Amino acid sequence: GEPQMKTPDLIKDEVQRLVKKGIAGYTPSNGIYPLRKKISEYYKRKYQVEVSEDRVFITTGSSGAFLLSFLLNFDKGDRVAIFNPVYPAYRNILKSLDIEVVEIYPDINERTINFKLIEKYKELDGVIISNPNNPNGQVFTDVELKYIYNFCKKYKIKLISDEIYHGITYDLELKSCLNFGDET
């Protein structure tokens, strides 16, 4: 998103406190340890999964995280599937890296995954999902998530699961792809 709200006073006060304290220089490239530890603890508390602090990388935003993830996982010419409609940054970043984008469209009359359709895409290097979906808000069921995870594992396809909007599903408790295994 692109929020237009003002910076809260609490944040401004903390920045001023740190500047007065004389903290200068760069943070570690993967983020400060206390923050990475808190995120690891959050995954344990929220999803009951162990995520080592070493697997957590802090970025300046989601697009930076996607760029790093794509650079780490894919090479020029790889084929990566996205489920439409989709957050445009996925497509744009992948194309800028000369990665072939394979667009999977849902059945126009359904809001669920057509498993038979997906079986046609075994020759992929990667799959990117957004849950809940950005922009339409569609939420994958546990069955759908598990299917996608197992499909990718079976065919050795790298899976990137964008779960940034998990906190705004109101009455739904969503699972992370990590609930089905560590290969995501």
Language-model-detected regions and their locations in the chain:
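Active-site PLP attachment segment
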Residues: 176-184
